[in-house]
């Protein structure tokens, strides 16, 4: 009971929100999405609200739905809301608002405003604690983002099992990957349920978003798939049960999802899940049907495609092909269903779905109201969407439906006809026939029954009938008999129909009769029964039209083939059996002729039989003229042009009957027969021609029937025949049939649709045949057609208008040109009407699509100037226009409307011209130029661009000009050309299209009429430069290329013809292009300028282009790249010639009266630049070209060839250029910048030469008296040698041969700068070529070391000379020895000079040390001791000089230490140590560095040999501390300097020890000990302490570095150390350093006493015997007490800190080294004396009177406990009394530390000391 109560109380405490628990409140308040905990904890709710409300306001601007929350969770009152104070109902209401907001904000969580807003929900309402599930699900789609990581950090630790998947990622502070979430959804039902519920809730709220639905769809689909996979089982029943359970869980979610049609992504996600279910679960048909209906009922326009894919997948899983009714209806309602299914079929299997659609189309055929489904069925087969097996199944479905259709009732005639046509397609199509034949062969269909049902013939062998088939057929016949009997019975009461069945379209009785006749077809008995019906009046058939007109209408109508053939057979039977042979049955002729064109051979055969029967009656006719149904065939008062009987007989006998056999075979034959008959040409050898009157009569007879016939199926067939005949017997088809056309025109669209639907003829076919009535041979054919649409177009059907214009278009080419002109005028006038009328649009389309003659186009063009003149007449008076701004025409609203019409008219005309292949009509050039003039004038008046019109005009002109260019002579009168207008188009328009067209036109005109164009051409190039050249499209590039290709050559030729200077004459052109450079796309610049220069002539114009570019852009990088590219394309002679002309231009620009430079560069003009600035830019660019072009390579290639003429030419031009450069140099010496630039050119020019040629040229130039020139060429040589000079043998020899010239300059020249340049050249030569022949360089070295060079007073020559000697030393090595004496003496003197006070020269100083470095490296043995002494002394002086750099000096000293003999180096150091110390810390450190390097870099043997001098140096250095101390205030080293130097000294000593063995080192050690302990008088206490300090510091390093192998050396120092411990104190400044050194020395000595371990000596030579040194009682007893007594120095906080830091570690290490219980007990006994403040047991003071001493002792105990652990605590019984006393100590620090020690002991022992201490 108690435990249960405790558990309840703990739960209550865990959930408690006690307001007094401030810590918990602060923790909760610091939970934040965007702020760090520390920051969040400092924020109040006002601050948080202000930040979050800003985000909320931004959200409201994004979506107004957020504003609803402004009154609730984001109100001012919300700041005071505390969930812990709200009631349960209030919290529930709050949860609703919070969840609604979270749902809405979920889609925007990656936006800062949304995160700020949610922050308020976290901080104020703590949604992460109270609405955890909803919050997690809101953030879950963003599980990969840092935001989700922030949420994880603030979620409660005790997450529910629903979200247990997140727990490890919350603990690890990492984002969860996708896989665990999918796995959780698969295995954790609550998680998946929560996710589904959340998604549906958000979607119902219309707050769904892509991130959520995409996440959910992916997770849910994978989860369902995973669940189904996991439920696989070897036992089918178990697996089925598990699958059913999963389906039961999933279907409600899908049902809810499908219900939300407007949430398209949710619906698509449900489709995905449905697909997974269908593919992975064995679903029952019921479930599949339900899913399919749900899918079909859920789709919208957005989801149709996905829905169809889903249906296709579901259908594939169905064993049956039948689709559920709702799904089928949804599919059939779709627009373009076949197109959609075709697109899907490329990626998914759709065969079952298509078979289901096929089955649905065939379902319940008798009850189908229309043929829409059968139409779809036909299209499925036509598009062949099914594979062969599925196609066979589909055909089987069609045949099954046809076979069983009578069971459900009679099929409509339309449906029967459609199915019959479809089966005919099966049997006749090349692609479908094999499959159909196979289907028939493999099935047991009764072909005869199928043919009977469809009233058609199936072209296949009937399968053998089985007994069962026969029985079935009997049953079917019985059922058919019942249907026929009932039909006949219903008609038996009908009286004779009053008129002809052809009199009107809609006759209900006829429909009933036709249905009954269809049932009778196939049975003679039934047909006989049917023909005896009273309604048909068979007995009165010769007198009244009912009987025959019925069968005429049937065989002429849209009925199955069998029905039509039987109807014809009935007529034939009647004709052959009639007794009245005097009747004229010519009324049958039009219908029978149409029947002969039927696609079915059977129908044609029956029609031929009927015609033969009529023909036989004519033969029997003796009386004639009694025409059957003459007055009432089509009703009363029909104007039929009946034929006289004998004429009819002639037609039959001469035209029709002879061709019947051919007509049976070929359906098109009768058309040819009638065409030839009516034209008077016989096609049959047995037939004879008809005379013209008879042909006329026959033609008018047929035409009148076509006009009067009310039925459109036979009318259409008759028209199809008649429309082959243009004329017959003096009349035309148009004349005869025009009434029919007018009648047809009068029908409304509804009437036409009704007519065509009833008779199943396409409207388009009828429209086309009607307008085909008008023949092109009719003189006014086009006008007749236009007359049928023009006056009353608004009331006409659009389809009729389209047909009329289609006919006009079709016959246009066959109409005479004069009639075309008239028609075109008419069409044009109509085209100017209201543009939205169908008639106007059709007229315009027609004019655009037909080939208009040139005369028509010319007339149209003449209208443009007239129209614009009329338009100007609408403007204000000329005076007012002149005074108005820009002469603009002011227009009223009415004027604007008129202006719009004029513009539309001009646009249409120019579009017609443009689309009529204007190149084939050169006569249009005049009109087009006039139109261009008018447009240009009008454009300037109205300030409008009119770009489109100009573009059309220019385009047409361009086409004409381009065609004209192909012929030798212009194809039009060139006097009409207006080049000025074309140029103005280029200049004044902003349209790129107009500009390009105008440029191309100028280019073309310059070819065919250059004299008319070139005077206007320059403005074009000016404009091109500012506009066209900057364009980067391919067309503009082509335009520019053509303009350059065609205009420039013509321009140059014109200038030459006029004997003008071509360069100055084209300056404007060049200026245009150079000015445009910066606007031309970078990748096109080179190609464009190259094309321009090539067309102009590279040799003549390249220099000008280069100069203009240089003048305008100076050293612009892009320009330089272009210039380099241009010159690199030229040959070497051309490039050099260009440079020569370029230099000539520079010279010209600097003249008082410039010539061509004024034209090209603007020198001397008002807006021109200063000549000097121009010259500088040109020369700098030229220097760049010399350096970076390929001239050097090209010249070398030429010189390497054997072409003497080419070589001579190059040398001549090069010499000329060199002379030009030198001449310019002489003339511009006073112009500093120009002179410098000219020098750069000279340098670059020389750079094009080989080194040998260069030196040859230099030798000549050095003979000139001009020192500036001589200096310049030597500097050029130095620069050339500094880079990568040639290394070939010839070059090397030539360079060395040049050395005497340079030596001579140094010896004899008074020009210091010239000498300097010569030395620099020698330096380069020695470095690059000295090793080739060192002996030739030595003489130069001697001169450099002489008075003539480094012996001069000028520092520049001195520095250069010393550096040169350094280079020579590196190159020549020992060969340089002859020059060494003088070089050393002078260089040392120069170094000393550079260090004199007030004359410091750092550059000279560095140069000398560089020389010494080189000498030390290459010939160290030549540096004597006195030289080394001098070098060291000067280096000491340099170390103290402020203006000197340290690097060169230090480098030289390092080289001395490394390379010079060790004895010489150490001897020099030993001799000069005192001077180093006098120089100060820096010099001393550097000297020690020399010693260190010498020891380190030389072998051990050298160290051993020089141990005496080395020891001398070390003892002098060790005494530095004492010496400085003795100097007192005069000391030059402070304590830090001494410490630093001693550290370096210790390092040197250790390095020395490494190279010694024990035998060698031990005496030195003992000598050091003696030196430190007894080397001074006893009175010199301070000196002794100083030496001991230095020595002990060394020992500290000694023991610390060499460790256990030198522990034995401690025996030498114990006595000294004990002595020091008794005297030195950390409290005494004079001995503190010594005391510290002692402590550290002992610590290192104790620390590395590693007894028992195998030890490898660092130096194999230093073999020392290792013993258990500090464990020995003699050693331990000697040192332990003095060491522990050091604790007594802890008398105040300062000394206590020092003792604890230094003495305690030493004591600890001693205890570790002692390593035995007895030793530890002895140490502890000594130590505990300092723990007791009172007197000991014997009454003597214990030593711990001072609390600081006790504290230090406690620290020692703590350290020992920590280091030794239980080993030390074996002495605990002895310690316990002391601990008890110390726990009662008066000093708080002591008491605190003893308690720490107690805890430390307890931790080691694992038990409490309480019992032991009591």
From Swiss-Prot:
Membrane topology reported for the UniProt record: Multi-pass membrane protein
Annotated PANTHER family: BAP28, HEAT REPEAT-CONTAINING PROTEIN 1
Organism from which the protein derives: Neosartorya fischeri (strain ATCC 1020 / DSM 3700 / CBS 544.65 / FGSC A1164 / JCM 1740 / NRRL 181 / WB 181) (Aspergillus fischerianus)
HEAT repeats: 583-620, 1042-1079, 1249-1286, 1293-1331, 1770-1807
GO MF entries: snoRNA binding
Described function: Involved in nucleolar processing of pre-18S ribosomal RNA. Involved in ribosome biosynthesis.
One Gene Ontology cellular component: t-UTP complex
Keyword field contains Transit peptide: no
TM spans (from-to): 942-962, 998-1018
Subcellular location: Nucleus, Nucleolus; Membrane
Record's keyword terms, sorted: Membrane, Nucleus, Repeat, Ribonucleoprotein, Ribosome biogenesis, rRNA processing, Transmembrane, Transmembrane helix
GO biological process: maturation of SSU-rRNA from tricistronic rRNA transcript (SSU-rRNA, 5.8S rRNA, LSU-rRNA); positive regulation of transcription by RNA polymerase I
Family stated for the protein in its record: Belongs to the HEATR1/UTP10 family.
Gene of this entry: utp10
Xref: InterPro entries: ARM-like, ARM-type_fold, BP28_C_dom, HEAT_type_2, HEAT_Utp10/HEAT1, U3snoRNP10_N, UTP10
Lineage of producing organism: Eukaryota, Fungi, Dikarya, Ascomycota, Pezizomycotina
Protein known as: U3 small nucleolar RNA-associated protein 10
Subunit structure: Component of the ribosomal small subunit (SSU) processome.
